[in-house]
Amino acid sequence: MRTPSKQEDLVKAFKALLKEEKFSSQGEIVTALLEEGFENINQSKVSRMLTKFGAVRTRNAKMEMVYCLPAELGVPTATSPLKNLVLDVDYNHPIVVIRTSPGAAQLIARLLDSLGKSEGILGSIAGDDTIFVTLTRDSTTEQLRGAILGLFEQEL
């Protein structure tokens, strides 16, 4: 059984590796952690850590798909890098559909869910590059679409 300090060291090393934005597979992360001296690291443990910390796959500066952590591991904000990930916002009667860059949907959905009912968002479901957002009783799809476009400073 790991002592808390070893677990904390593992989490620190894991986060530091993802900040490098160079790991395209879970196997590469396992290898890097093993090279740093951590024992009993396997793909399933890395997968659980990626989920726990909200890691997503996105393109790095070299346009490679890599694992990275959302900014500050907190609730993301609509800063310039995020707004560039939103490609299209459309709607039908009950749902607003958002298209994003590949791998960005979960990050954008997390931001939208953090805004919640005050912005007319009841909840969202995200895939790899598509988000379905459902609205509260007091909102219209047109209002919600406008709020989302305003959040990402888009005119789609």
From Swiss-Prot:
Family under the similarity heading: Belongs to the ArgR family.
Pathway noted in the entry: Amino-acid biosynthesis; L-arginine biosynthesis [regulation]
Chain segments annotated as transmembrane: none
Main function: Regulates arginine biosynthesis genes.
Organism the protein comes from: Photorhabdus laumondii subsp. laumondii (strain DSM 15139 / CIP 105565 / TT01)
HAMAP family: Arg_repressor (MF_00173)
Signal peptide coordinates: none
Record-given protein name: Arginine repressor
InterPro entries: Arg_repress, Arg_repress_C, Arg_repress_C_sf, Arg_repress_DNA-bd, WH-like_DNA-bd_sf, WH_DNA-bd_sf
Subcellular location: Cytoplasm
Gene Ontology annotations of biological process type: L-arginine biosynthetic process; protein complex oligomerization; regulation of arginine biosynthetic process
Primary location recorded for the protein, binned into one broad class: cytoplasm
Database matches in PANTHER family: ARGININE REPRESSOR
One GO term describing the cellular component: cytoplasm
GO terms assigned for molecular function: arginine binding; DNA binding; DNA-binding transcription factor activity
Swiss-Prot/TrEMBL keywords: Amino-acid biosynthesis, Arginine biosynthesis, Cytoplasm, DNA-binding, Repressor, Transcription, Transcription regulation
